[in-house]
């Protein structure tokens, strides 16, 4: 049987953790690094950080936030949102992300084709 894991997912907008229902009535709920550390202290096995507006706003990734997360959190974490090119994936992984999450087929085939030989 596979191990059960607790993996909180934090939605990020403008560098802050936000909460809403179906992306409506979004409220700022705090610093993503502090909240991630709290989840880690409470026993989370991993974390997922999703930049919920990066793709829609066609802006670049939050690499500086990824570096802060990597420096302050001692459990694996995944980054998603706005990853469209191989260079995006590489920058996030080099900044300290353990995993990346991609959501579009074009991104998947482009990035998977590049990284498949490393698997």
Predicted regions and their residues:
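Broad structural signal for hydrophobic residues in well-ordered alpha-helices, predominantly aliphatic
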Residues: 69, 116-119
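Conserved N-terminal beta1-alpha1 strand-loop-helix module at the mouth
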Residues: 1-75, 83-87
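Glycine-enriched alpha-helix->loop->beta-strand junction motifs that scaffold or abut catalytic
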Residues: 43, 73-75, 91-100, 119
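Conserved phosphate/oxyanion-binding catalytic-loop motifs
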Residues: 79
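Glycine-rich phosphate-binding active-site loops on the catalytic face of alpha/beta enzymes
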Residues: 83, 91-115
